[in-house]
Structures are given as C-alpha cells and as structure tokens.
C-alpha cells in the first residue's frame, strides 16, 4: 500500500473545504476554529493578513481591505462583462492591470495589488496548513476542484494558484464529478444508474449527468453557469434593501462601503433563515448616520426577487439532458450539492421539472466536493484500499474545441461533452491561390463566430507548395489528455511538413518569472505569519508569567519571606510590564522575551529563596511529627 498522502481541496467562491483519505474513509478536516468549512476570505490590516474565519470577522469593520469572491475573477479579463457587473457590489477596489483584474488594498500602511490567483493561493495555503496540522506532517500533493464549466483560462489560473501556495497539483477535476464520487463510493451498483448532480454554490452553478455502474463513473454531459450562485441572490436582497432604505430615509447607502458590508451580512443571514422559515427580519442597528434599519422579508418576496435566477438554474439541466440524449424519466437520482441547493424554491422547481421526483439528499452539500476530491487524490497517489480499487472516472470536456476558418467561423474539431482523453483530426485546405502559409487559430466555446469564443493559441504552418486554392490538404489533429491539456498538430499531406503547439493558455497567464515571484511572496507571507504567531505566543507567555509572579508576590503566605522593598520593586515591574503589553500589542517576539527576562532577573532569586524556606519548613514539620507509632501495653 502506498504511504503517500494527498489531499482534496474544494476551492469555493464563499467557502472552501479540505479532505483526506485515511483508515479506509474520507476525513473532512476541521480548521483551527473547529469548522469543517473555511470562508474564502482574505483580510489585510496595518499589522497582518488574515485568512478564513478571522478574515470574515474583519469584513464589517475593514470592508475595503477584506477580499472575497476571488473565484469570480480568476482567469477572467478586466473588461469581462461579468467582472464589470460584479464590481458594483464589492466594497473593495478592483483595478485594471494589463486588462487583468487586481485587488488593491492597504496592507501595513502601504498600497498593495494582488491578483485573484494570489488571493486564491492564500486560501489554498490555509487549507494546506489545516490538513498538515491534522495529518501531522506537511502535505503538498493535492487535487483541486473547479466548476465544470470553467474554461481553460480559469482552470490554468487555478492551477497557478495551487503552485503559488506550494502545492503539487496532481489534477484539476470538476466539482460535480467529485460530488458524484461522494455519492457513489459505497454504491455496489451492478445495473447502470443515471445520476444527475445539481451543484449550486455561492458563486457558480454546475449540472452533470453521469452513469454509474460497478465503480465506473461515466460522465455523459456537463453544463453550467459560472456567474450564478448564492452571491447573486444576496445581491438582489441588498439592492432591494438599499432602495427600501432610500425610500424611507431619503439617504443612499451606496455612499458607505461599511454600511453595505453590514447590510450584505444581514441579507445573507436572512436568506439562510428563509430555508427553514417563511418569514424573517433583516435588522441592522445604526446602519448609516445613526439610523436603525429593519424590514420584514417573506420567503415569497425573496422568491419573487430572485425568480429569474432560480429559473436560470434549470437551463443547464435541460442542456445536459439534450446533450446526453436522455429523457428526464431516465434519470434515476438527482443529487443536491452546494449551499444554494438548500433553497426551497430551487428544490421545488427542480423536483417539478422531473415531474415531482424526490430529490436525493444523502450527501452533505457543503462537503461532498472536497470528499470526492480526496477520493481522487488517494487514487492518484496509489492508495490501494479495497474500496478504491474498482473506481474508474471517465470525464468529458465541457467546451467545444476548434479553429477559425474563413469568415471568422468557429469550426469544431472536438465537440463539447466528448470523453477525454481523445484525439480527433480534420482536413482543411487553403483559402487563396499560391498560399504557402496557413495560420492555425485555436478556440474554445459554443458560439458560431470565433470572436465570441475564447482564444487558446495561434501558430503558422509554413512551406506549403504553391497551388490553386483548395488543392493543398492540411490535416489538423487535436489531442486532448486526461488533464485537459490540448496538443494541436497541423501537417501538409503532400510534403509531410508539420508543426504543433501544446496549449497551456499562455495568453493572459503569468510568466514563469511572475509565478516564481509570487511563490517567493507567498513564502514571505508564511514567514511573516510564523513571526507573528511566535510574537503572539511570547506576548501570551509574558502576560501569564507576569500574572503568576504578581499572584505569588502578593500571596499572604509569602508575606514573611519577602522583604518589603523587593515586593514593592516586583509589583512595580509587573504593573510596568502589563501596561507595556496593553499599549504595545504588536511588538516582535524578541521585545516580549526581553521584558520577561527583566522580570525573571528580579523574581528568580526570590523564588529560589522562597522554595528553599518552604522546603526547610516542610522537613521540620516532618521531623517533629516523627515518633513511636505503637504504644507499650502493660
């Protein structure tokens, strides 16, 4: 059995989760706060950067420097329509750096800029630390999940984030596929079962239809919307409340980032409450300019505000049924994944779509993706547990891959939902007479024109013998591996001249030097965190030691054994140190250690004397009580 350990990480828009395969099962690992999911938040202050729960606590008091939703920006251009529409809801600043979105924050009183990959790497680093602390040694091998409908840019950017975090990313896998592992691991299914995974999370929505039989997980079709999730429902509630506040108090909340952040937190809480009750109150004390705000929100009103978004959640369901050529009656199980799948209206619409079919709630919606990623990680590092032996995953490519032909037309070579790995070829010809060079432009997407799709790369095949248009035969081959890496070859059949390119989507990605710089910065963050922790530990030890010395020196039982001048000097030193700690909470470890030594130099000689005196008293008492233990009987 392999003794290598690898972890599975669900890098979520709003929450992240990590799991590991141990002792024949998946363990979902709790963080240092005891929570099994960690907020995907990073906060920057004058003294430190915080990740997870501690960062989310900062959101209300430090909104402009507390970053969330990095997943909605990763791998996207600044001018992307979804980036521009999301920006108006964020209290933090997003700037344009080479048509890439960057977060601008104040950290240690300096203006700093961080890419979505860097913020994501900090969250991944937190998950890595959480797992390493639980396992008892550093873990670097990991499987990271992404939405099934993430394009190549977003997948590669996520992989870069993992590398910056110091992880060896074994594989990037689709979230609903991972959730299918969580559902199907213990199912001894000898008859084929069609399972639909409905995954609606905080920022993205995926639907995958797969068949499950004897440990074979065969993805039939996948679809989704990378701009639909719980955050969008929160946005609708925030907009509604802002308008309500303006109507009631003639004041625009959009003036205050802090007020909007507090309102968003209250709206998110109300949304969750409406999953179990039909009415709740959005209430925020002193929201803006001293005004206490409260409004009643019914489930019916919430459903009305988000009705178009809820209906949009069914579009990928229709698409996967169409692509897989299955009727809805042929779907045996509908498995719910992601926090937003708890919303009653979402469940009702989904059940009604399948003619009232009961939905499967056997997996934990918040943990299923990390659970499945941990299974895949264990398989990839060669864990030979019997339960893992027969599991085989056959996945598909979520987007069509092709090239541009005359008129800017997208001509597919590999259609979406084609099983991977795969290899496909098509023959093309020249467009002009005596054309000696052919430009191969590679795209992914479903639109008819390449300008509306995602450009993956370009190369030229030269040295084609001059001939009339339509005569040369150029064979173009697309070879897509299990990791989704595409190799494209173009060959002139008459001369056997060929050229190829491996698509790693360098367009818009970081250079090797940039990634190395980010890795160094991540290590600097880690070193700073370690120094900060050491300083906090030293400060706590100084406080505890000072309290114990003060307690000892003022103990009535020691009053006869300590000279008044010494007692006064030590009490004064204790008061001085406690005042210093209160006024200087952010000093380095060495400073706190030095203050402790000052107190030790005063107290230790007295402590030694006290110990010796008490020891002598104990010995005397013991001697005095020693005597005959029997009495002579006459």
UniProtKB/Swiss-Prot annotation:
SUPFAM superfamilies xrefs: Actin-like ATPase domain, Heat shock protein 70kD (HSP70), C-terminal subdomain, Heat shock protein 70kD (HSP70), peptide-binding domain
Any one Gene Ontology molecular-function term assigned to this protein's record: ATP binding
InterPro entries for this protein: ATPase_NBD (IPR043129), Heat_shock_70_CS (IPR018181), HSP70_C_sf (IPR029048), HSP70_peptide-bd_sf (IPR029047), Hsp_70_fam (IPR013126)
Keyword Chaperone annotated: yes
Alphabetical list of Gene3D superfamilies matching this protein: 1.20.1270.10, 3.30.30.30, 3.30.420.40, Actin, Chain A, domain 4, Substrate Binding Domain Of DNAk, Chain A, domain 1
Family, per entry: Belongs to the heat shock protein 70 family.
PANTHER family: HEAT SHOCK PROTEIN 70KDA (PTHR19375)
Biological role: In cooperation with other chaperones, Hsp70s stabilize preexistent proteins against aggregation and mediate the folding of newly translated polypeptides.
Protein name: Heat shock 70 kDa protein homolog
